[in-house]
Amino acid sequence: MTIRTLAVIGTGLIGTSVALAARAHGVSVYLSDRDESAVRAAAVLGAGRPQLPRDPVDLAVLAVPPSQIAPVLSELQARGLASSYTDVASVKALAEREILDTAPDPSRYIGGHPLAGRERSGPLAARAELFRDRPWVLTPTRLTSRAAFGRALDLIALCGAVPRVMRARAHDDAVALTSHAPHLVASLMAARLREGPVDAARLAGQGLRDTTRIARGDSRLWSDIVESNAAAVADILTRLQEDLSSVVAALYDLADRERGRELSGKSRHTLVDLLDRGAAGVGELDEPRPGQPVPCPPR
């Protein structure tokens, strides 16, 4: 199965990067966005034509916030925009539930999420190579057709990414830990810079810049993302809160020099234990992971 025509709905960083990657392989791409200036900017970059096609395209990619996936899909299917549909949102379960309930033809849709991005947003930050060698999760439902599954795999191949298949809920639980909660933690830390001692930011090293870099993301988009995965993110933050409370108590104990040695020893152990667990956790990011075979689509 080969994609010859593609529609991209939403010309931000991810949507425009998908369009640029497809254009690099000779695919005819049509662009649409509520923000006309974003469409024009993407078109100037060579991402495609700033209009929707007259005839149905092979695949439509919905690059809109998670809360908008289901209503936009219903609208596009009603007008017959494409033979198959996918999206690139970073939350899957919410849209999946709504699509199964409301979409004119859920069999033509498959959820998708390329795990790639930049701290900058908008079409001018887009890159055709953004997805190269990056995981791209697909979340087929019990109704997803072979055609929709196959076209999504074709798109992933065009973008140079690596397909992985997951259930929507498992995906959302995973990215709550690896993406959504870290973004909030980075925002909390960065926000303190505006409330800290005068000129404290001038003493910042590369470590703080690395820690807070992702806080530069589009706040409205990230609010939608976190809200769409609120329960899973709250669970992660609750566990962080428990660890943080233990460390705060330990630090106050260590700061009180009049405390006994036994109590100080326990507090020091709490602190060292957290640092050790953190170092071990970073190692998880360096561990090679075996590739997951892509199973046949549900039907």
Predicted segment positions?
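Rossmann-like NAD(P)(H) cofactor-binding subdomain of soluble oxidoreductases
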Residues: 72-125
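Internal alpha-helical scaffold of NAD(P)-dependent oxidoreductase catalytic cores
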Residues: 128-216
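Short glycine-/small-residue-rich Rossmann-like dinucleotide-binding loops
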Residues: 64-66, 90, 114, 189
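Phosphate-coordination loops involved in phosphoryl transfer and adenosine-cofactor binding
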Residues: 2-5, 57, 82, 133
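Rossmann-like NAD(P)-binding element
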Residues: 52-86
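NAD(P)+-binding Rossmann beta1-loop-alpha1 motif at the extreme N-terminus of oxidoreductases
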Residues: 1-51, 59
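Interdomain hinge/lid region at the active-site interface
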Residues: 199-277
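Residues at the starts of beta-strands that form the adenosine-phosphate
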Residues: 5, 28, 108, 135, ...
